Amino acid sequence: MSKKPVRVAVTGAAGQIGYALLFRIASGEMLGKDQPVILQLLEIPDEKAQNALKGVIMELEDCAFPLLAGIEAHSDPMTAFKDTDYALLVGARPRGPGMERADLLAANAQIFTAQGKALNAVASRNVKVLVVGNPANTNAYIAMKSAPDLPAKNFTAMLRLDHNRAASQLAAKGGFKVGDIKKLTVWGNHSPTMYADYRFATVDGKSVKDAINDQAWNKDVFLPTVGKRGAAIIAARGLSSAASAANAAIDHMRDWALGSKGEWVTMGVPSNGEYGIPAGIVFGFPVTTENGEYKIVEGLAIDAFSQECIDKTLAELQGEQDGVKHLL
């Protein structure tokens, strides 16, 4: 028996990441090759953006995806999020020249407060929300706080791009196949302060840390390379990473919806006090997923260097949160 279509809302749908994302969702890469989807696409109510969205929709139609059961164009989150089962919040205000961080936080607080309220009002009560637009953790926190009738655990931020970047760097350093690396995680904020942690990682059951055995490389090369990878891509391409961000969003949602089969993945999720992270902060943790639920991997030893890295990324997140509290 064929499955009933699910509703997937995507914001910033005509942007670079949206363009790299939508065709893959429509082809079944995110929710499975047997799951029809209805795309509910949101763009700002600006004529240029809405026209660009029309063009993307024409292309989606021209792919004749068997799983694409419907496409809607919206300029208002109250209609875009109606009954949605999955919401990928990609659109955010980018940092412009001369813009202070406080201005960026305030501009995004406005967007994500409105979107959180709309999700609260009209989305499915089991909606799974992934915030991709930066600052992703804080934007997820704002949306979550603006949706008091939805479970806090339904709001997540994307750390999977950092996770995938870290896996790729480790594979290159150790001569591993990237798909063989297990038990890697990224702690904290999706920002250069994130802490990519391979102390528990294995390849074919053997320790990656022992194989690499180079703490100076970890501290001076690996962590800065992963942390500043986004900036390096902007410098090289003149545009921010779009296809890799879309790919990470697909990975995050696919694992959340369909299960990680016991493997660790990284998600930014609201803390319940695990690892000393204050409750409610949206923080990158190692998780496993099954039956549409994620579970934080608990009981991992945190050494002095790791604690220092976790404290640093936590301090940054608390600073961001303090910067938006008066706006909520």
From Swiss-Prot:
Pfam families: Ldh_1_C, Ldh_1_N. Its EC number is 1.1.1.37. Keywords: NAD, Oxidoreductase, Tricarboxylic acid cycle. It is an enzyme of class 1 (oxidoreductase). Substrate binds at R95, R101, N134, R165. One of its GO terms (biological process) is tricarboxylic acid cycle. The keyword Lipid metabolism does not apply. InterPro entries: L-lactate/malate_DH, Lactate/malate_DH_C, Lactate/malate_DH_N, Lactate_DH/Glyco_Ohase_4_C, Malate_DH_type2, NAD(P)-bd_dom_sf. Catalyzes the reversible oxidation of malate to oxaloacetate. This is Malate dehydrogenase.
